[in-house]
């Protein structure tokens, strides 16, 4: 038996991402898409496997946010911590070293009425091994998912 020791990550940091996205649709429609039709708006280029069949959220405490690869295969992105339907849902996720970690992420999606539509607020706190570049890309990733994914999907009806 052999043992290999590696130096602990030196890019330990905490990053806070806050984002607001205006959606021209009622809050209930936004909530429904956010937690029940995620697979329809979640960007395919964010999938971890080319064989992914769908992306799902189980909107209950202890529920999963996960990629379904078919059969019993897939990738767990996060576990649901709190649900206050149809207003907010909070998750705890993990970034493995394959995706820039190891790091933990606590993120929350909130839906509010805003004029004739909705305001989606995304808040994510990531702490762990993240390079400066990875930390900067967290904001870009959430922006792409919600501005280029959720927003046009819901607004098309």
Give each language-model segment a name.
Residues 64-70, 90-98:
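Short beta-strand segments that buttress and anchor functional surface loops
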Residues 84-89:
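Short, conserved beta-turn/loop elements at beta-strand boundaries and strand-helix junctions
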Residues 19-21, 77-82, 105-113:
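Hydrophobic/aromatic beta-strand elements that line small-molecule binding cavities or substrate pockets
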Residues 95-98, 123-130:
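Short, solvent-exposed aromatic-acidic interface loops
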Residues 2-3, 126-157:
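A conserved amphipathic terminal alpha-helix motif
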Residues 37-75:
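Short beta-edge strand/loop motif at the mouth of beta-sheet-based domains
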Residues 1-52:
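Hydrophobic ligand-binding cavity/cleft-lining segments
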Residues 30-34, 65, 80, 91, ...:
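Hydrophobic pocket/interface hotspot
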